[in-house]
């Protein structure tokens, strides 16, 4: 599957998803370690999944945990990248000891705030993940500019029908694909994900 933008599959909660990611050449697998999230995965389960798969970079997605807790868990699991959605100050991030992706919620941030946030964290982060349920056409200019200046993972609204257009218009560094839940252990359908991948790779 060929596309200039990389792909991230998240949240990984089972071995089936991890194997799918590896088989399809997906660059990043996200594991949710935010205890307040419905997608929270026990670290011991994540460790089992990570040990059985290879080929994709592992991304630990954290919530409001303390910096030291994040650093210790990311080291214990040998995570490749840490994704943060909390308010840890930029100059504290090197203490984590891993490449950092800063998650930004556009639902609560206007264009000026977004520009300031990107500028403040850029020296300490390898990239940013933009989250939210915004109407992207209303913020097209700032999103194009952000994707041009920074490594942006697109976790904003898209559908199979328009994903190719989004990649062409905004040119994000990567796009986040949503991993669903297993119907039962070891059994899962991937029709929707395959449809998105086919749309991305279509001429």
Residues covered by each model-derived region:
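Conserved N-terminal beta1-alpha1 strand-loop-helix module at the mouth
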Residues: 1-154, 158-203
